[in-house]
Amino acid sequence: MSYQVEVCIDNIESLHNALEGGATRIELCSSLALGGLTPSYGFMTLAAKLSTVPVYAMIRPRQGDFLYSDDEFAIIQQDILSAQQAGLQGVVFGLLTADGDIDVARTRVLIELAHSLQLGVTFHRAFDQCRDPFAALEQIIDLGCERILTSGLAASAPLGKEMLTQLVAHSQSRLAIMAGAGVSPVNVADLALTTGVKELHLSGKSTRPSKMTFIASGSKMGAADQDDFIIPITHTATIRNTVLALKSIS
């Protein structure tokens, strides 16, 4: 298949579902509801053992923006080491300055660290919060990233098709532009054909009910409107249908 389908997951059940659906790469996270945070070392280790395709770990120490303190930067470096020690193939991160530019100095340190550990690097959707996407694109290329995950600076990739098309043209195959946010079996073929992207990113999110037979109703583990007995998972058929839609245009 000439297209890559990366599936972002935040639990081991979703790993099995993504692989069964035909994912060609995994982005390993925790807390997808928060945009994806760094997965645990245990999760990284087991995913490395089970996966039949490359696994890249999200390296994001907290929710929120991508302007990191010195302590957070130290955490990021340690988590990159952990990803390599767990046996993963790559890492995913993004760092910005306060005024919306790529934090070139710190990003260079992280990329050099990752490359010294034989890890690939994806620059994530922090890119979509840059003030000058084309300057940022050139900086990320110069820094040596393999790809950029982006919605085309829009709320979703289908809404960002014009920018995605421009980014693909400007990149001139010096790195991959991977479209993500709102990608589905319904829109993926049009998205790929219209923009020229060869890599697509989605979660294929669904839910399943808890297998608990006793449901405690008086306590909450998270937000008041969050159902603790609904488990978010990747939907196998969504991934499979996305892969099939792309095969139909390959």
From Swiss-Prot:
It is found in: Cytoplasm. The keyword Cytoplasm applies. Gene3D superfamilies: Copper homeostasis (CutC) domain (3.20.20.380). One of its GO terms (cellular component) is cytoplasm. GO terms for molecular function: copper ion binding. Pfam families: CutC (PF03932). Keywords: Cytoplasm. It comes from the Bacteria. Coiled coil: none annotated. Belongs to the CutC family. HAMAP family: CutC. This is PF03932 family protein CutC. It comes from Vibrio vulnificus (strain YJ016).
